Regions:
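Extracytoplasmic cell-surface/polysaccharide-interacting catalytic and binding patches
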Residues: 4-280
Length: 280
């Protein structure tokens, strides 16, 4: 489903957008592109701010920025108690460390590993765990502590664990010229991601096992919601009951094709349409 934007969207050059989220186990999508964009604009650019939306996320100038905003931008409709970055991605480790140093965080131990989140997200997460225990439902972190907070190097490692094997495979199948492979090492991340967008559009998938898009398997370095400490990945099958427990406490599945991934938005389900999200 594609959505036409209003004048606001035209102003930033984004004419079509698909943004997915999940509510009560169903895929969710922007109900009104204008509602989503307008809300995000107000959320990240208050009246007193001198920053423009383009500085926050240059979707009109960069296919990289447009892609990550579409894939992971649902986090920017989070409640006001969630601290959000001033850019839709972190350009490097220094930028991420500066942001993370300003966060009020809290930790707990789950299955023997530390789970660290922004304090409001953790308070809600503990309610989810408590409700799950009362119902004898098991919730475990996927891949240890990186199920929650991540460092910049974590995001690089996870991306490369999908990207590099797929690149080698498609090159071996002569689907990607060796010259393109050689250029990858020195290519800036945004341009590298744009090449992946082109390859996947042509049917060369880079996700796990090359069965799905890499963008539903992992986010490019510096773009993951985990870097803002408001995401959690669940190991094992995500049942409707588990989804309902998370949804009831302000957590929703917001990344297309990644049902294990929950994002803390900190709002009730009924509030989501007002922020530009709806069930699909």
């Amino acid at each position: 489903m594609t959505l036409r934007m209003n004048d606001f969207a035209a102003r930033i050059g984004l004419l079509l957008i698909i943004l997915v989220a999940a509510v009560v186990g169903l895929r969710s999508q922007q109900s009104q592109g204008s509602a989503f964009l307008d809300f995000v604009s107000r959320r990240v650019e208050p009246a007193s701010s001198k920053h423009t939306f383009g500085k926050f996320c240059p979707v009109d100038q960069s296919r990289f920025a447009r892609k990550i905003f579409i894939e992971y931008g649902a986090m920017f409709v989070a409640s006001s108690d969630v601290q959000l970055p001033t850019s839709c991605y972190f350009a490097d480790e220094a930028a991420l460390l500066k942001f993370q140093s300003t966060l009020k965080t809290s930790s707990t131990t789950l299955d023997g590993v530390e789970i660290r989140l922004q304090a409001p997200a953790m308070a809600s997460f503990l309610k989810v765990l408590d409700a799950a225990r009362q119902l004898n439902v098991s919730i475990s972190p996927l891949d240890g502590s990186i199920a929650a907070a991540r460092s910049y190097s974590d995001s690089v490692s996870i991306w490369n664990s999908r990207f590099q094997p797929a690149l080698v495979f498609w090159a071996s199948q002569r689907k990607i010229p060796q010259d393109d492979v050689d250029q990858m090492a020195s290519m800036p991340l945004p341009k590298k991601v744009e090449k992946v967008i082109d390859w996947e559009t042509g049917g060369l998938l880079f996700g796990t096992g090359r069965r799905r898009s890499i963008f539903s398997s992992t986010a490019p370095p510096g773009t993951s919601q985990h870097l803002s400490l408001i995401a959690f990945d669940i190991a094992g099958k995500v049942t409707p009951l588990i989804t309902a427990l998370f949804n009831a406490n302000g957590w929703f599945q917001t990344v297309s094709g990644d049902p294990d991934h929950f994002t803390y938005l900190g709002v009730f389900e009924g509030e989501l349409p007002k922020r530009g999200l709806k069930q699909i």
